[in-house]
Amino acid sequence: MAPASQSTYQKDERVLCFHHEILYEAKILDVRHTNAEDKKSPFEYLVHYKGWKNTWDDWVPQDRLRKFTDENRELATTLRREAEAAFRQKSTKTTLKRKAGSDRGSARDSEERQTSVPGRVTKRARDNEIEKEEHFYTRPSVRIVMPDNLKSLLVDDWENVTKNQQVVALPAKASVNQILEDFVAEEKPKRTSSADLDVLEEVIMGIKEYFDKALDKILLYRFEREQYKALRKKWEAGSGEYSEKGPLDVYGAEHLTRLFATMPELIAQTNMDLQSTNRLREELSKFTLWLSKNSDKYFATRYMTATNEYVEKSRGNPSAAATAATTRLV
């Protein structure tokens, strides 16, 4: 880690720099303190984006820069593809919306001309609702990178549980806590400043908190709830192998990946600014790319087939043997 008196990035260094949501290759032209009279003030960097006109040269804070490593280049490529896909999707929706609007235009104009005062009040109320909805959708969104193999694993996971009536064997072979600890251990040496380390720690803490609160509310399929109830009794009792354990120690990669699939909707309900949103997206995307590369290590290779008694209980038809059946599953 560079000392406070030394800049993390040097003049003429090749780097990657964020411009809005995308990382671009750039070169550092100059380095200075944000306050020339205070040598302890943060550094800022004059960057030139490769292939761009000099008029785009800009002084940027350190948190917009990334080292020019293979890992960060892969992230830059992935973020660009995600942004291009989102732009194409948005363009398609806009075109369809305009076409539908023009088709309804004359009829709507005629209707509004014939509407009385009460109708105008209704229209105003409708416009207010539309304005609220548009405000919601203009909040910074977090398009987390979800590699194809993780998407495929999510589909298989859904089919195993909902169609095949199977459940993941729990405790998982690698818990959520263990997976996150492994990621941090590998990621820490790459963090060149205390600020970057602080961000990493905050994000990991946030993931744990989200998982803990979201598990029984949105991450479980209905068929898994009986298994969850049985496990919860064990860790709340705090006896045996479940002593001082909780969801983060019992569940693993399958349910953690489900969380990341729902994370954009969860974050959309917060009031983060664009800069914070972009940084969070970068951190979460780094994790999904890492998990994708290590999927063989963390995901279950097989699911457990539920007993008939468990199936009946999951449908709300308890039987005398159901409790024992649930216990055998966990």
UniProtKB/Swiss-Prot annotation:
GO biological process, any: DNA repair
UniProt keyword Cell cycle, yes or no: no
Domain annotation Tudor-knot: ranges: 13-66
Localization (cell): Nucleus
Domain MRG stretches: 138-315
SMART domains listed in its UniProt record: CHROMO (SM00298)
SUPFAM superfamilies registered for this protein in UniProt: Chromo domain-like
Region of interest (Disordered), residue spans: 86-125
GO cellular component: NuA4 histone acetyltransferase complex; Rpd3S complex
UniProt keyword annotations, A-Z: Chromatin regulator, DNA damage, DNA repair, Nucleus, Transcription, Transcription regulation
Biased composition regions of type Basic and acidic residues, renumbered to the chain: 100-114
Chief subcellular location: nucleus
Keyword Nucleus: yes
PROSITE patterns (UniProt xref): MRG
Similarity remark: Belongs to the MRG family.
Purpose of the protein: Involved in deacetylation of histones, chromatin assembly and chromosome segregation. May act as a transcriptional oscillator, directing histone deacetylases to specific chromosomal domains. Component of the NuA4 histone acetyltransferase complex which is involved in transcriptional activation of selected genes principally by acetylation of nucleosomal histone H4 and H2A. The NuA4 complex is also involved in DNA repair.
Quaternary context: Component of the NuA4 histone acetyltransferase complex.
Protein name: Chromatin modification-related protein eaf3
Organism of derivation: Aspergillus fumigatus (strain ATCC MYA-4609 / CBS 101355 / FGSC A1100 / Af293)
Gene expressing this chain: eaf3
